[in-house]
C-alpha cells in the first residue's frame, strides 16, 4: 500500500491507467479458483458500457485486451447474433447534469420483449426504472406515430405490448442517489427518472 502522492502531468501520448493484481486468499475465501470466463464476460460488458475504456487481462501469461468501439451496440450485437433482425437500430443518448441514459433498441422476429437494463454499469433485474423506461417508450412511440400520421386522430394509442413485441433494448442509466434492496444491487428500489 502506497501513500497518496502527486505525480504531476503525464506527457501527451503516454499511456495512463490503473493496474490491479488480484489473487484470492484461502484465509478469506473457501473457493479460491478464479472463474476466468466470468471475468472475461464482465470485462467485455464493462468496456461496452464505458466506450473508450481499455481493460487488459493478464492470466498466467495470456494477455487479452478488451475495448469497445461501439458501446451498447456491441452488447446488442451479442444479444441478437442468432436472431433475425427486422429493423434498423435506434440509438439514444441523453444527459442532464449527473443523469445520463444510453439506450439501443432493435427489433427481431421474436414475439417477446428482451430488456437488458444496467444502472451505473451494474446489471439489474427489477425496479421502477424498467417500468418507467417501458412507459417512456410507449409514450414516445405513440407521439412519433401520430406526428407521422400513421395513427389517425380516431385511432387508439398503441399499447406497450404492441410496441414491445420482438424488441431488444439494452440501456444504461447513470444517476446519483440510487437505492437498492441489497448489496448485490440487482433490484433498484429508488431512482429519480424525472430528467428522462
Question: Which functions belong to the PLM regions below?
Answer:
Residues 25, 69-72, 83, 87-89, ...:
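Intrinsically disordered, low-complexity regions
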Residues 57-61, 94-96, 107:
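Short acidic, glycine-rich loop/turn motifs
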Residues 16-20, 45, 51-55, 88-92, ...:
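Structural beta-strand/beta-sheet cores of well-ordered domains, especially the beta-sheet scaffolds
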Amino acid at each position: 500500500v502506497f501513500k497518496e502522492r502527486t505525480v504531476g502531468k503525464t506527457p501527451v501520448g503516454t499511456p495512463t491507467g490503473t493496474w490491479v493484481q488480484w489473487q484470492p486468499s484461502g484465509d478469506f475465501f473457501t473457493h479460491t479458483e478464479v472463474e476466468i470466463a466470468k471475468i472475461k464476460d464482465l470485462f467485455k460488458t464493462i468496456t461496452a458500457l464505458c466506450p473508450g475504456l481499455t481493460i487488459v487481462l493478464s492470466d498466467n501469461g495470456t494477455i487479452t485486451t478488451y475495448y469497445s468501439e461501439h458501446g451498447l451496440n456491441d452488447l446488442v450485437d451479442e444479444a441478437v447474433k442468432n436472431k433475425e433482425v427486422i429493423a434498423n437500430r435506434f440509438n439514444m443518448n441523453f444527459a442532464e447534469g449527473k443523469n445520463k441514459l444510453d439506450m439501443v433498441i432493435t427489433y427481431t422476429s421474436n414475439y417477446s420483449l428482451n430488456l437488458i437494463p444496467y444502472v451505473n454499469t451494474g446489471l439489474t433485474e427489477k425496479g421502477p426504472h424498467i417500468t418507467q423506461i417501458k412507459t417512456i417508450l410507449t409514450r414516445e412511440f405513440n407521439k412519433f406515430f401520430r406526428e407521422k400520421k400513421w395513427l389517425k386522430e380516431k385511432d387508439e394509442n398503441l399499447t406497450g405490448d404492441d410496441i414491445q413485441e420482438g424488441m431488444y433494448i439494452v440501456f444504461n442509466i447513470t444517476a446519483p442517489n440510487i437505492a437498492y434492496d441489497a448489496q448485490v444491487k440487482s433490484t433498484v428500489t429508488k431512482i429519480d427518472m424525472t430528467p428522462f
